[in-house]
Amino acid sequence: RRLKRIGAARDHDIDLAAQVPHGAVRLHVMGERGAAREAATADDIAQMAEIVAAGVAAGALGFSTSRTMNHRTSRGEPTPTLTASEDELVGIARALGRLGRGVLQVVFDHTDRDDEFDMFRRMVSESGRPLSFSLVQNPFEPESFRSVLARIDRARADGLAITAQVSARAIGLLLGLPCTLNPFMNNPVFAEIADRPVADQARAMTDEGFKARVLEAAAGDKVRKLGGGLIHRFDAMFELCDPPDYEPDASESIAARAGREGRDALEFVYDLLAADDGTTLLYLPALNFAGGNLDAVEVMLRHQHTVPGLGDGGAHVGTICDGSFPTTLLAHWGRDRQHGRIDLPFLVQRQCRDTARTVGLFDRGVLAPGFRADLNVIDFDQLRARRPEVRYDLPAGGRRLVQRADGCQHTFVAGREVMRNGEPTGALPGRLIRGPQFSTRRIT
C-alpha cells in the first residue's frame, strides 16, 4: 500500500525506487524492545523476515540496515538496528533468498570489521542475494580501507557478490550562519542574535562592540569545551568558494590563512561569516581526507568491486549537500585533478551501468537498443558544481542546502527531455520502479 501511495502521490521527472528499512520493520515487530535494541527472538526474526519479503515482493528493490553511531533518533539515541544480531540479519536475508529477488545494503562504522564482514559473507552465502555496503577512509585508521577491499576480493573469489559503495570526494560538514552548525553556535553572546534572519545576524556581527563580546565569551572555559570538537577544527576547515574546491590544500585552511595574517583563527572566521550578508560557507572534510588529499578515494574508485555512491542530497539538509557527487566524479576525477586522473569512459560506466546493476536494474545505464533512454548531454569542458546555497522552501519555511551545476545541457528520461541547461522543462515521465528491471535485449 505504501508503494502504491508513493507511485500515485505525484508525477516525477526521474525514476525513483524504495527499499524496506530495517529500523521501521524492527519497531513494528518488537515495539519498545526493538527501540531498546534488545535481542530479537526466533519469532521476532520470522515476523521481520516475512514483512521484508512481502515488501520486496511488492516492488521494493531490497532491504537496508544501519549499524552506525552516526545515525540517531530524534532524541539522539542510537537507531534500533545498531546492534541487531547476525541471526537476525541472516534470517532476513534468507527470506529474500527464498523469494529469489532483492538486494541487501548496509551502512556500518567499520569498528568490528572482522566480525561484521564475516556476517556479510554469511548473509550472502545463505541467501544468494547481492550485498553492498558503504566504505570510507577513517581518519583514525587511514589505511584500514585497504584491508576491507582485500576482503571483498576474497569474497568475490569465493563467489559472494559483495560490493563497496564509495564516494567521489570527502564526506564532511558545511558550516555557516545559514547552516545547522557554525563556530559560534555555542557562544552565549552570539545566541542573542541566533534567531534573527541570516542577513540581520551578519549586520549585527559587524558591530565592533558585539564582536568583542563574542570573542571574549569564546575565550571562556565552558565555551571552549563546547566548541572544542569539529566546529573549531580550523586547521581542517576551509572557505567554500564558487566553484567549490573539494580537494583544498592545507595552506588554504582557516588556521593557515589566519596565521599568514597574524590573526587568531576564531577572529578570522568571525569576519568571514559576517561578510557577504552572512552567506559564507565553511567546508570541513571529515572522512576520505586523511593526509589532506583524496588519494584514498582514488584507490577506492579504481577498485574492481566498488561503485560510486553515498551522494547524500536529501538528508541532514542544513549540514550536508552531497547530491553533486556524480558531477565531482566526472569533472574532478576525469578532468581537473592534477595527478591520479581517471579515464572518463571508466567513470561513466561506473556511474551509469555499474550502479544500476548493483541494485538490480539491468534495463538502464547503457546506450543501446532495448535499454532505457535515460541520458545526460554534457558540455564536458563546462561541467562543474556550483557552491551550495540555502533555500527556505521546506514545510513551515524549513531550510535546506541545494546545489546546482553547470555544463549539463540536456537530461532525458525515457526519451523525454526533463532538464534543459539546468532548468526543468515540465516533462514528468518518471515513475516508481517496482523490483528488478531487465532490458529487452541483453548485452555483456
Where are these regions (language model features)?
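Surface-exposed loop and adjacent secondary-structure segments within mature catalytic domains
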Residues: R1, R5-A9, I14-A35
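C-terminal cap of metal-dependent C-N hydrolases
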Residues: D295, V299-T306, G311, N376-R431
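Acidic, glycine-enriched loop/beta-strand segments at the rims
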Residues: Y283-G291, V297, D343-F346, A356-V390
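Divalent metal-coordination and catalytic microenvironments
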Residues: L16, G59, Q165, G262, ...
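Short, solvent-exposed cationic patches
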Residues: L432-T444
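Short, well-structured alpha-helical segments that form the helix of a local strand-helix-strand
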Residues: E267-L273, D343-C352, L367
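Active-site neighborhoods of metal-dependent hydrolases
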Residues: Q19, G23-V29, A36-D44, M48-S74, ...
